[in-house]
């Protein structure tokens, strides 16, 4: 039902817009952190932090396999750049695909999203994000299993913190379980070159996000 409501919301947005298309060191964390059944321990939004990315209009989104999330974000008008990488793990030496896939580094497959707020808001990007993920799933999305596929939204400034907290609180109230990590970005390392723009290079490649949903958001303007 909620997805239907969101679809109607985006359809309304499209009509209104004329369907225009327009490092820091961190302590080692356990990748299998225990949580309450409602996922409450995943909220770290009130942590004291020193931001590592000084750009205002950047958000980091972990939404399962980064191929699909990168492609989704790139399809949204107003997104300047989307880069696949590994976030909030142990150290740079562990930030490679083979090591991360072992599930022992704490790294999440994450997409760094830089956007133009004159064309698209952070609210809109987060709405698109929550539309395509399953927030009730821990350490998995689609057919992918492992701590590297844990969902999360990682902010880099105070303004984004408040927006993320507000949207996350709304989403948290929609189900009994909510396992999306909410907190500051601690580190981020770009993924290997062959992961960048993977679905653009391999149009028939695996993606846990339906193509129809990407097409929907390619006409998004808020």
Model-derived regions: residue spans:
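Flexible coil/turn and secondary-structure edge motifs
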Residues: 2, 19-222
